[in-house]
């Protein structure tokens, strides 16, 4: 299915408290205000930011089971999608945003401070390869790298129960097929709410083949 901007805002408003909605509106305003200075999102998507970026990020939240505080790492956060949106929607969350471009690092930190969530949102301003290994409960990556590059890079940030949420375009099925000989786990391809040609790879128990039998596609 696809959404209009009005439908996207209504979808969010029906799922978050008023204060969270205000935070998301402020996030949108800050990103649009910054656009003349750096290309945070494609100019062609600015008029559909609620559909293409806010709801596209927020649709990941219901995929995470309810429980205690989560440690979430978002790879290649860019303008803060999905990581900053998720952090606003889940106040118990501890979020790490990984971004290597200096102007975007500074902007992500500015947004976290301005939104009042800097105490639980860490911006790791370096390349993923240089980041110290640590286990996280959720790993997300939106337009960061193809799956055959992403899994080897990011696996050291997972544990046995880590949930992987990987928004993809029309390449989701082919990217998944490309890793079946080298990786095992429970993999699903879930249609995106915001683009009929896009999908989300949802995975758990992800392991290199030969490193244990924790599930199969």
Swiss-Prot record:
One of its GO terms (cellular component) is cytosol. GO terms for molecular function: rRNA (guanine-N7-)-methyltransferase activity. InterPro entries: rRNA_ssu_MeTfrase_G (IPR003682), SAM-dependent_MTases_sf (IPR029063). SUPFAM superfamilies: S-adenosyl-L-methionine-dependent methyltransferases. It is an enzyme of class 2 (transferase). Its EC number is 2.1.1.170. It is found in: Cytoplasm. Keywords: Cytoplasm, Methyltransferase, rRNA processing, S-adenosyl-L-methionine, Transferase. S-adenosyl-L-methionine binds at residues 76, 81, 128-129, 142. It holds the Pfam family GidB. It catalyses: guanosine(527) in 16S rRNA + S-adenosyl-L-methionine = N(7)-methylguanosine(527) in 16S rRNA + S-adenosyl-L-homocysteine. Specifically methylates the N7 position of guanine in position 527 of 16S rRNA. Belongs to the methyltransferase superfamily. RNA methyltransferase RsmG family. PANTHER family: S-ADENOSYL-L-METHIONINE-DEPENDENT METHYLTRANSFERASES SUPERFAMILY PROTEIN. This is Ribosomal RNA small subunit methyltransferase G. It comes from Rhizorhabdus wittichii (strain DSM 6014 / CCUG 31198 / JCM 15750 / NBRC 105917 / EY 4224 / RW1).
